[in-house]
């Protein structure tokens, strides 16, 4: 099934509007999510229900706003999925944050700006599930951001050589 351009545009706009509907919130007191370890903070995202959640992914982005020059800056990190024992609910921990690292281009003096510097690594794309909160533990001093991903068209066949 192929979507017409207008249907693709409507689906894309709907996803953009729904992204703004997710909100941070409190956890259900009955579910024993662990307390944050020393030096970590717990973040909770409540996602809106979607008609096609099995084809939607959630991309997590962890970073901090820093004064940077014209080079490309980033942190290295890994997202590890854990499970609340006895409940089977997932939660995520960002660990092994290293850096920041940057390219080494010569920058004109006075070009520093304030920018969000994100961490890159494995595990940052997770399952979209509006039935459970998305619980993410990140190091203190860092910020959690997210966005959703959804396919805009069917797979295309690659012809054989």
Curated annotation (Swiss-Prot):
Signal peptide positions (record): 1-24
Name assigned to this protein: Putative ecotin-like protein
Classification via PROSITE patterns: PROKAR_LIPOPROTEIN
Species of provenance: Methylobacillus flagellatus (strain ATCC 51484 / DSM 6875 / VKM B-1610 / KT)
Superkingdom of the organism of origin: Bacteria
Keywords assigned: Signal
Keyword Signal among record annotations: yes
Family of the protein in this entry: Belongs to the protease inhibitor I11 (ecotin) family.
GO MF, one annotated term: serine-type endopeptidase inhibitor activity
Entries under InterPro entries matching the protein: Ecotin_sf, Prot_inh_ecotin
UniProt cross-references to NCBIfam families, sorted A to Z: PRK03719.1
């Amino acid at each position: 099934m192929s979507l017409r351009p207008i249907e693709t545009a409507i689906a894309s706009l709907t996803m953009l509007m729904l992204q703004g509907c997710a909100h941070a919130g409190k956890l259900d007191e009955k579910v024993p999510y662990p307390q944050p370890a020393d030096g970590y903070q717990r973040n909770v995202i409540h996602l809106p229900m979607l008609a096609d959640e099995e084809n939607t992914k959630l991309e997590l982005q962890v970073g901090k706003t820093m004064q940077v020059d014209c080079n490309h800056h980033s942190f290295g990190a890994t997202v590890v999925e854990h499970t609340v024992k006895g409940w089977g609910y997932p939660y995520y921990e960002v660990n092994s944050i290293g850096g920041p690292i940057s390219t080494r281009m010569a920058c004109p003096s006075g070009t520093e700006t304030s920018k969000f510097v994100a961490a890159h690594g494995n595990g940052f794309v997770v399952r979209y599930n509006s039935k459970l909160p998305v619980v993410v533990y990140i190091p203190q001093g860092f910020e959690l951001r997210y966005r959703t991903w959804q396919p805009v068209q069917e797979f295309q066949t690659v012809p054989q050589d």
